[in-house]
Amino acid sequence: MKVCYTGGAVKDCGSYYSVATNAVELRIWFLTDDILRIRAGFDGDWDEASYSLTMTAWESRTDALMQGCRKRVEPAAAVLTDGEKQAVIQGERLKVVIEKEPFRIMVYDKDGSLLHADIPDLAYREDSNRRRIHASQIEADDCFYGFGEKSGEINKAEKYMNMAPGDAMGYNAKETDSLYKHIPFYIRLNRGTKQAVGYFYHNTAECDFNMGREKRNYWHRYSSYRTDAGDIDLFLIAGPSIREIIERYTDLTGKSVMLPKAALGYLGSSMYYPELPENSDDAVLDFIDTTREEGIPADGFQ
C-alpha cells in the first residue's frame, strides 16, 4: 500500500511542477489558464501515450498518429512560492495551494472560491490490490452530471457507479450498470454558489465512482474515484458555468463532428430484426411500413 500523508519540496521543472510526498511523486501542469493536470505517478515511468487528448503541452508516443487532430500548446504562466508548511502556485485565473502535513491539494479561482480540495489521507492512495484511489471534498447538496452512458437519474449524487464497458443489450434503463460508453468525466455543480467544475480522469482502465454514497465522519463529505490500473491522472476544468466547462473539455478531448441532416430525424435501431431466424430483411421493411401507417416520420433504420 501507498498513502500520501506528507508533502515535501515543490519544484518548478519548466513545463510542470514536481511535488514530492512520502509515497509518490505528483506533477502539476497549468495546461491553460482554466485547465489543470494533476498526475500521481504510481508507476514511475510517466509514459505519455494518449489516444484521448487533442490538446497537450508535452510529447506523446501517439503524436504522429494523432497528427492533424492534436494541438500542442505552451503551458500557461504561473509562479511558485514554496514554504515549509505549504506551497502556492499562482496562475492567471487559478491558484493551487499544496498543504504539506497532512498532505492535500486545493484549487481556487481568481475570486478566491474553492473549486477543488483533496481529502487528507484519502486523496492519493494505492491499496493492497494496486488499485489507485483519489478522494475529493464535496458538499451534501452537490449535483454530479456526466460519466458517459449511464442509466437512472441525470444527477448522480449519492450514487456508486462502475465503469466496465460491455454489451448490455436489454438493460434496465433505471438500474443497469455499466453500459457501453466509458467516459470518466463529470461535472460537479454546487447548488448554493451555482459554480461548476469539471473532472476528467485520463485513464481507460476499469474504474468506479462513489459520488458521496459512502460517508465517514472522520473526514469531510467526499467523492472518490478508484481505478484498477494506471495513474491517477486528473484534468481539473474550471467554469464557473457548465457551458464553459463543456467548451473547455471538448477543447481537451475533441469536438463532435457535424451531423448530417438525416441524423436530426428519427432513426430506428434494433438487433431484434437482424437476429430473426428468417425473413429479417422483410421484418425491417415491415417496421418502416408501420411507421408510415402510424404517421411517424422515420429518416432511417440501422
Regions found by a protein language model. Give the residues of each.
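N-terminal accessory segment at the very beginning of proteins
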Residues: 1-271, 276-289, 300-301
